Amino acid sequence: FLVNMPPDDPKVKKAAVHAPAGKFRKFSRFFFHRFAPAAIMLVIVIGGFVYGSSSGNMSGEKVIVYNWGDYIDPEIITMFEDETGIDVVYEEYETNEIMYPKVQSGAIAYDVVCPSDYMVQRMIENDLLAEINYENVPNLKYIDDIYMEMSKQYDPENKYSVPYLWGTVGILYNKKMVDEPVDSWNILWDEKYTDSILMQDSVRDAFAVALKSLGYSLNSTDLDELEAAKKLLIKQKPLVQAYVIDQVRDKMIGNEAALGVIYSGEALYCQKENPDLEYVIPKEGSNLWIDALVIPKNAQNKKNAEAFINYLCRPDIAKMNFDYITYSIPNSAGRELIEDESMRESNIAFPDISQLKNCETFNFLGDENEIIYNQLWREIKSK
């Protein structure tokens, strides 16, 4: 059997690329902890794997969930099955781009999927999602209005998605290596930090940094603006130690770099491991990402899907997920249950709304613009 191999340390975060934003998720131990001791039903379909539930439910009720690797506390799955009698059939993916064609093909009728903001938009535009019956999701009341409003950037009428987890992209810096205030993307072009800057190895993330530093939208499709951003990234390239994925976490914890572009959930973990690290959302603004729960149009267990979504919106369950994953929850009541005050009041996990005023979610820009972005990125990397 081919499976996602987990890291040895359960605290090592996010080993899969979350495109375009490149967020990293742990490869799950879920398969080993939950299914290895039990009888395993493994269905191989177009290169993917669906894992059979081990709860022993004989009612036939089930919900088929397709989620990022280790993006849920596995105990929640057990609790949901025990409390509802609904078996959870669980499959994981590494990127939105792996997930999308599998949902689009309809070969497996997934009931719940967790795409990123821009991918929700794409799935809506391509008529792949069912409207959620919110009468079956009463716990939606615990999702803060601000996140429902933000989600309108990709789901304009809030018909198809429920915010699950969210975060920001910013700069993680070492206070002992950086001797000036960090409040702007411009510091990533300071020659003083040559060979001590880490950039995300992701086309949209890299362009977001450059576009925002120039005062443009990170969703720009203006060719002149994109060309200006390309030139800025080429100018920066001699200063960059590495274009990285999950290595930014390890390098910053190990004092191997002074500055790194990173995701807020990763930054929170890094700061716990190295108290010399600080995180900031630059004043020009950044990417605010939201991963959302949706129901594909061909789902065969829609009511069970809504029951599962409702369960994840329960405050105590949201709190369990935060403790396990350390990415921000949009659930205000769940946040109040976080015992660790430093985490509950963390400015990284829960920044003040004023810090988000110039932030944007990524939009799906269309296939033609994706080609343009990728071509410009190749030009940058080849210099």
Language model features with spans:
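Extracytoplasmic ligand-binding site segments that recognize negatively charged/polar headgroups
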Residues: 109, 114-256
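Conserved C-terminal helix/tail region of periplasmic/extracytoplasmic solute-binding proteins
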Residues: 354-383
